[in-house]
């Protein structure tokens, strides 16, 4: 509510999660991957191993290369191929899939033992969150559409599809 009222009044509000979701909605974002893990965001262990992200640093099972030798592009391509949203059949009928993309790989690994598994334990929460953000977006579009123009000039970080 605070974020929405600030946007309608043309003021900055620091709740970036809402702003990012509204930006994704405004720009028609449809994510093939939930985050930058294995794409542009990677983690490095103290031994120099490069992993999917900071949460997997030190895990041999999620290693994509080393600082010395660089990223193993074949391993990276295999990871991206198997983790593409199109392969998450549990998500195939979900209306929130373009913004969620199945959720965090580390959470899936921790909860299900499989990074390819969609995070089904928080689907209802994600749908509720997306619904709230859609309603906030609609009200801002109705009451202060000029506020949304900032997203016309500021593209999101490119998502791999």
Feature map (PLM): residue ranges:
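C-terminal accessory region of radical SAM enzymes
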Residues: 1-25, 54-101
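Short, flexible cytosolic linker that couples an ABC transmembrane/permease module to its adjacent nucleotide-binding
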Residues: 27-31
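Radical SAM enzyme core and accessory elements
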Residues: 10, 47, 86-161
